[in-house]
Amino acid sequence: MQVPESSLAHLSEWQRDAFVLSSGTCLPQQKAEVYRAHLAQIQYAWANSEISEASAVHLFKKYAEKYSAIIDSDKLEIGLNNYADSILTLAKCQRNESDKWQSSLTTNNVLKLKSVQDMAVAGRRTQLSKSSADASVRVGNGINTSGYSAGLGNNVLRNSGYTVPHAALSDCQMPGGSANFLQKPKISAFTIANTTSVANTSSNTLINNSISMTSSLMQSNEDKDPASFSGHMFLPTTSVHSGKRKAYSALGNESSDIKPNPLVQRQLTNKEATCESGFKTAKEQLWVDQQKKYSNQPQRNPSPLYGGAKKSLGAARSRGLHGKFVPPVPRQEDVQDSNRKVYGQGNSEMNAPSDERLKNIEPKMIELIMSEIMDHGPPLNWDDIAGLEFAKTTIKEIVVWPMLRPDIFTGLRGPPKGILLFGPPGTGKTLIGKCIACQSGATFFSISASSLTSKWVGEGEKMVRALFTVARCHQPAVIFIDEIDSLLSQRGEGEHESSRRIKTEFLVQLDGATTSSDDRILVVGATNRPQEIDEAARRRLVKRLYIPLPEASARKQIVVSLMAKEHCSLAEQEVEAIVLQADGFSGADMTQLCREAALGPIRSIQLMDISTITPEQVRPIAYIDFQSAFLVVRPSVSQKDLELYENWNKTFGCGR
C-alpha cells in the first residue's frame, strides 16, 4: 500500500520534532514551537478524517498539557516568556526615554488614600484609649507664620481653642538640652490666674528656645511617617493666631510680634520639596523648565506663562468692536520683549548673537533655519547611487573638489553658485544632494518651499535673507531645495505680491550686487518640472544636469544591492531577465518591485500556519516572485514625459 506524499511529509515533520525534544540541548522556546506544531497537525489530521475523534481528543489533551506546562511555568530554565519576543520586536526601533518618566506613585499620594487615612485615625484612637491620663495642653503662643509650633513649654496659654493630645506630645523625643521642654502636665487645665503668671514667667524662655526646639523637633521626626508628623505638630494658622489675639486681649497684655524663624522656614521648604508629588501639570512643568533654562542668569524672574502681566482675558476688561485681541498663549515676540525687560542691561552681552552678521536677524528665524540643518543620518558615498556616472563626475569636478581645496579652485576655476537637477521622479536627485554635502564636508540645509513662506506680509523675504546669512556663517554650505519649481516658478501678471517678493529676494541673495565671489555657498535645486522655472532662476542655476532613468547596469546594481540584504535564491540569468524586463523603471520603481517580490514567500504561507512558522522556515525569494511582482508594479514615467525631459535637456541642459 502506497502512503500519500502529504502523510510522508507529516511523518517526517513529526520525526524531526521528536528528535528535537529528545535532544538535551532543546530550549523551552523550541519545545513550545514543537508542541504547537503537534497541535496544528492533530487538528489538520482530524479535519481530513485521517484520525478518529477519540484519538484527536486524547492527543490534543496530551500535548496541550505539555504546552501549557511550559507556558505557565515561572522558572527561567523550563518556562517561556510567551510575550517578550513579539513585544521586543515591535519596540526595538522605537525611542526609549524611560529616564524622563516620572512616577506618580509617591509616599504623599499613598498617604492621601482613604484606606490609609482610616488606618491612621484608628491607630491614633487606639493609642489615645491606652493612655493613662487624658491631659490637654492649650497652645496659643509661639506660632510662626508657616503654622509650625515654635513655643511649647511646661505651661502655655489655653485660649487658642486648639487641643494637642498628650499621646501626640509623647511621640516627640527631644535632645538632652530640651528634655524637660515638653513634659506630661499634672492637671488637665489651668485657671486664669495661673495663666497670668505663666505668661509673665515663661514667655522669654519660649522665645529664646524656639530655634533649638524646632530644629531638634525636625531632626527627631525626619525619619517618621509624614502623616503622623503633620497630624501632631502642624497647627492651623488662622485659629492659632485668632486664639492668641483673644488670649492677649483677655489678659490685657500687649502682644509682641514674633517674626518667623528663617531656619524653620528653610527646613520646612526642603521638607515639602522632598515630599512633592512626582506628577506635574503642563503649567508647572513649563515653569520648572524655564527655571532650569535661566537658572544661571542672576536676578531673573520667570517669564509669564500665559500672556503678560498687563494683559487680561475674559471680562476683566471690556473690549469693543475695535478692542485689541489678547491671545490666550503669548506670541514669541511678547515673550522675548518681556524677557528683555526683566533681564535689564546686565545681560545684554549674553543675549548678543555670536556672529555680527546675525545681529539684525530675529532669533526665532535663526532657530527655525538651524532646525533645518541635516547633520544626522548615515553618510552617503557615491557608490551608493546606482548609475548616473556623468552627473556624478560633473558634480565632483565643479562642486566637491572646489570645496575641499578652495586654495586651488580660485578665479575662473571657482565653483558655480547653483546647480539644477532635473529629470523624472524617483531617479536619485535627492540622494545626489545629500551626497554632495557628505563628500564635501559642508553644512547641509534641506529647505522646503513651505519653510520660506509665511502668512504675514514681509516674513517670507526676511526668512530668505536669514537663510543665506546663516549659511554664510557656516561655510562651506549646501542649500538643497527639493521641488524648486514651486518656489522659483515663472513670474506672471496674476501672481501675488508676497510670492513675487520672495522670488526677488532669493534671486538677489543667490547672485546679486551684495553677494561675494568668495562665499562657498551652493544652491542645489531638484525638480521634475524644469519648464516651469523662471528665466532669471534658470540663469543663476548655471549647471543644469539631466538625471535620466537608470540604465540596465544601474538597474542590476539596485536589484543586487537590495537582494543582498534578503534571503533569496536568484541565479545570474534570472537577475539578467529581471533587469531586461524592468526597462523603463525608475530607481523608486525598482525598489518597489523588490519590495513586492519580497512579499511573495509570505503570501505562499497558509493562513493557519502564519502564527506557528519560524523565520527560518520562510522560503527564499525566487524568480517566480518577481514575475508576480511585475503584474502589480508598473513604470511611473510615461514615454511622453521622457520626450519632454529630453527636449528640455537639449535646449537648456549641460549635456549628458
Swiss-Prot record:
GO terms for molecular function: ATP binding; ATP hydrolysis activity; hydrolase activity; magnesium ion binding; protein-macromolecule adaptor activity. Pfam families: AAA (PF00004), AAA_lid_3 (PF17862), Vps4_C (PF09336). The keyword Metal-binding applies. InterPro entries: AAA+_ATPase (IPR003593), AAA_lid_3 (IPR041569), ATPase_AAA_core (IPR003959), ATPase_AAA_CS (IPR003960), FIGNL1_ATPase (IPR047858), MT-severing_AAA_ATPase (IPR050304), P-loop_NTPase (IPR027417), Spast_Vps4_C (IPR015415). Its main location: nucleus. Keywords: ATP-binding, Cytoplasm, Hydrolase, Magnesium, Metal-binding, Nucleotide-binding, Nucleus. Residues 331-340 have a biased composition (Basic and acidic residues). GO terms for biological process: ATP metabolic process; microtubule cytoskeleton organization. Transmembrane segments: none annotated. Residues 293-302 have a biased composition (Polar residues). It catalyses: ATP + H2O = ADP + phosphate + H(+). Its EC number is 3.6.4.-. One of its GO terms (cellular component) is nuclear chromosome. The keyword Hydrolase applies. It is found in: Nucleus; Cytoplasm; Cytoplasm, Perinuclear region. Residues 293-354 are annotated as: Disordered. May be involved in DNA double-strand break (DBS) repair via homologous recombination (HR). May regulate osteoblast proliferation and differentiation. Belongs to the AAA ATPase family. The N-terminus is necessary for its recruitment to DNA damage sites. This is Fidgetin-like protein 1. It comes from Xenopus tropicalis (Western clawed frog). The lineage of its organism: Eukaryota, Metazoa, Chordata, Craniata, Vertebrata.
